[in-house]
Structures are given as structure tokens and as C-alpha cells.
Amino acid sequence: MSDLENFRVEVKDWLDKNCPSTMRAGAPADTPIDEVWGGRKAVYKNPDSKLWLDRMGEKGWTMPTVPKEYGGGGLNKEEVKILNEEMFAIGARAPLLSFGIWMLAPVLLEYGNEAQKREHLPKIIKGEIRWCQGYSEPGSGSDLASLATKAEDMGDHFLVNGQKVWTSYADKADWIFALVRTGPKEPKHNGISFLL
């Protein structure tokens, strides 16, 4: 058997033992369906939702390509394909969807320093912290080059002044990542920073 064939057997076995029946195709129609955004404010009507998130997060499979040192699964593309195929085969629902997974984690992996990666990636992967994005502003909408929220570097922190709007799920988020203007004298498409 090849390594990938062995991995497929391992995934099937793990899913069989760890994916609750209410998180699979064929679950009773009256099974409560929870949001899968995670975070400290999450409320789970179905305890299996939290159990499934915890198990997948512990395995690192909510972000399977992230290196294990940051809490991810450390899988390669072929292994992720197998994981997705086997989850699809049993109709397993995604244990976690979030701005942290879609938008923040890739930025941290590419541009974050080591401390930021170690602090935030494991919490994103396990669904412990929920993030929202702070991009849109009154009068600018999706024209991010025209944003006016300013951030002044105070040495050990930034002082942020401005307003963000249309921030989906801000009321349920634990943290925000935002685009802010740190170079006010630069052309409007420059001088923008990404703050946590």
C-alpha cells in the first residue's frame, strides 16, 4: 500500500470513530444545527457540534495545510484531497467556518511574525477565538484606498481613530483585524496597514 492509500485508511477510520452521527448525512431532521463560527461567545444547541469542532481542531484538520507547529494538520495537497473526499463520502459537515480561517490565517502565515503565528493560529484552528474584518467605512464602502481610519504608532501599541461599518458578526467576534491608515501623507493607495 502507498503512503496515500495508508493515509486514506487512517482518515476513514478516524472519521468513523470521531465524527458524531448528527454531524453526518442522514442525521435526524430535527437535529439542531449550530453555527460553525466558533469563538468565546458561541452557543451550541447540539453538543455534538462542539465535540466535532474540538476533535477536528485537536487534529488540526480545520486548517489541514497549516504546519503542525502552529496547530494545523501539516498535510500536503494530496492528503487534503483525501481528507475532503472522505468527509464528503460520509456527508460530514464542516466543523468550523470563519474569517480567521479564510482571511486572517493566510495573512499571518505569509506576513506574521513568529509570536503572532504562535499566539493566534492555534486559537483560530481550534475555533477558540472568532474574528471579524474591519474594512468598510462610511462613504468608502469597498473602496479601501479611500479609508480614513488612522492608526498612530505609540511604541507598544497603536492608537486607532476612525469608524468601521458593515462589519459582519462584530457582535459575536472576540477580535477584529482591520485595515487602517498609518501613512497619512502617502498617496491614498499606500500607507495602509493591517492591524489585529
Where are these regions (language model features)?
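Amphipathic, small/basic residue-rich leader segments at the start of a protein or domain
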Residues: 1-98, 115-126
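Short, solvent-exposed loop/turn elements at beta->coil junctions and helix N-caps
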Residues: 69, 136-140, 165-166
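A short, Trp-centered hydrophobic/proline-enriched beta-strand micro-motif
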Residues: 127-135, 179
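N-terminal glycine-rich flavin-associated loop
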Residues: 96-115, 141
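Conserved protein kinase catalytic domain
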Residues: 84, 105-108, 121, 196
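Hydrophobic, small-residue-rich alpha-helical packing segments that form membrane-like cores
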Residues: 140-143, 158
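A short core secondary-structure module
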Residues: 148, 157, 161-196
